[in-house]
A protein has these predicted regions:
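Structured beta-strand-rich core segments of catalytic domains in phosphoester-bond hydrolases
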Residues: 69-160, 269
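Metal-dependent phosphoester-hydrolase catalytic domains
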Residues: 151, 174, 178, 185-196, ...
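Sec-dependent N-terminal signal peptides
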Residues: 5-13
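Active-site-proximal beta-strand elements of phosphoester/diester hydrolases
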Residues: 31-43, 107, 120-124, 149, ...
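N-terminal, active-site-proximal structural segment of metallo-dependent hydrolase catalytic domains
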Residues: 16-86, 97-104, 181, 293
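Metal-dependent phosphoester/phosphodiester hydrolase catalytic core
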Residues: 142-144, 153-181, 190
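Active-site neighborhood of phospho(di)ester-bond hydrolases with catalytic His/Asp-centered motifs
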Residues: 70-73, 95, 197-201, 223-226
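Catalytic metal-binding/acid-base residues of hydrolase active sites
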Residues: 40, 76, 167-169, 202-205, ...
Length: 293
């Protein structure tokens, strides 16, 4: 009986390993994989969905898809440090939104150090407020909100580009609109060469004016969902709570945006779950992209 169990475990491990290798090899050599993932902050009132009950699933999911960059939202410092310990090939940038250090939620940006390096002095977090250089909130925002970004170099190609990660306010419409304008201004200031990606939980659907501010005019932010050369894979929603349900309406509030000189090869929203529950109340969004030479 023990021998049979061990044999089955070995077979499962081999199949899982082969599946992972197929996933890795399916990605084109010069392409870049991006993920945006709201982790849900460690709330002790979440019961069965508390962080300690799902953190291994979150780490396993990220490890399996192995994005070159992933921007997480809502994670507290111990959640970010847990992922840092579990995902050894990654480093990260970001600060707590409450004090600019370790307090409060982070919108940290994680990158694979095997292939990419952060260009010295470019990693930064600003507040989406009228005083962006200090912990603050403005307009009708319920909470402080931040934008974390850095300029990275691909060690294999030498190409340099910016990646931005953010989490917009869940209450203040004016704050969200002004936050969108701040991001556009920051892109225009730093990435005028057109090499950039924007990840985040924007807390708006496509019919909200914030989406129009982001996607219209210059600098252009192209929704990877609509520009994928291959059909979208997975659900059409990114936020519906922990419990798996049927008949969920389209509700994308988490996005990956790309610049004009980028091909989007693939786009997916990942609906993995265990025992009827997702590992977070948001689903991760992933895209495979490639710069146009």
């Amino acid at each position: 009986m023990i021998k049979t169990g061990l044999t089955l475990l070995l077979l499962v491990s081999i199949v899982a390993g082969c599946a992972h290798e197929r996933h890795q090899s399916a990605q084109q050599e010069d392409s870049i994989s991006l993920m945006s993932y709201n982790l849900r902050f460690d709330n002790p009132n979440d019961g069965i969905n508390a962080w300690d009950n799902r953190k291994e699933h979150v780490a396993a999911l990220i490890r399996f898809y192995a994005p070159d960059f992933f921007g997480q939202q809502e994670g507290l410092i111990h959640q970010v440090e847990y992922l840092d310990d579990e995902l050894e090939e990654y480093d990260w940038i970001g600060v707590g939104r409450d004090d600019g250090d370790r307090a409060g939620e982070l919108s940290s940006l994680h990158y694979n150090t095997v292939r990419f390096e952060l260009i010295e002095g470019t990693g930064q977090t600003i507040w989406l407020s009228e005083t962006p250089d200090e912990p603050s909130r403005s307009w009708d925002a319920a909470l402080p909100r931040v934008l974390t970004f850095g300029k990275f170099r691909d060690k294999t190609t030498g190409r340099e580009f910016y990646v931005f990660n953010t989490h917009f306010d869940h209450i203040g419409q004016t704050a969200r609109e002004e936050s969108a304008r701040i991001i556009k201004q920051k892109i225009e200031e730093l990435a005028s060469d057109g090499n950039y990606f924007v990840l985040g939980d924007f807390n708006v659907r496509e019919d909200n004016p914030v989406y129009e501010i982001l996607t219209m005019g210059n600098p252009p932010l192209r929704d990877a969902f609509y520009h994928s050369e291959n059909p979208h894979v997975g659900p059409l929603f990114t936020f519906e709570g922990f419990e798996v349900k049927s008949g969920v309406e389209q509700r994308r509030i988490d996005y990956i945006f790309v610049s004009e000189n980028v091909r989007v090869l693939n786009h997916a929203i990942l609906g993995h779950f265990r025992n009827g529950y997702y590992p977070s109340d948001h689903l991760p969004v992933i895209a495979e992209v490639m710069f146009v030479e």
